[in-house]
Amino acid sequence: QSVLDQTKEVLAEIDRILAEAGSDKTKILKANLWLTDMATSGQMNEAWDGWVAQGHTPARATVESKLAASGYDVEIMVEAAV
């Protein structure tokens, strides 16, 4: 699965978790993103830019790292107000 598709799936899961907590992506304060290969950052950015709420872009850091779960190329952690 491409990084673009993986990122879209992760962002959909973030939407779901935030909704369960009574929040949404406009209340994200900070996001940390990990990629197994920074050469795929364009795909990740395409998904991110299409998802993030205009006027509510949180602080964000993206780094290259080996991920704990094999088979995944992107991991995203967000902190949001509820």
Where are these regions (language model features)?
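Short, polar/acidic, helix-capping and beta-turn segments at strand->helix junctions
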Residues: 1-82
